[in-house]
């Protein structure tokens, strides 16, 4: 059976790019895997054209923020519930929190994944994880070394661990 893997890094453009080598590493380790990435709306375009990502799941933060500002709490609750239901339908085998914050940890927990791993979990997000990998295990002299360290800890191939951002043919022209 193919692995269904969810990566969660909701925001921070640079960190999303720094974490991008993990997608290829997971694909090399699990060639039949389905890779999904949960990301906040403003950053979805960074991942949308990556051919190795099967699905970019967009956290509808703008809609939820508008409903909250308009004090439409029941509509907000319905939207959040529908989103969680849709997320769980994927039946993820593995969810990895690349952000380590409570907001990303909650989504990893709500994903219903049978295995949940957090990178440097803090703010209480470790309570949603089965395993936490120390963010400081990487080489501090190398920027974003925590993602390389995470890959090594998960037994992923790291021989080619280079950052990549896929762009649409229109954007490349």
Where are these regions (language model features)?
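Catalytic machinery of carbohydrate-active enzymes
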Residues: 1-173
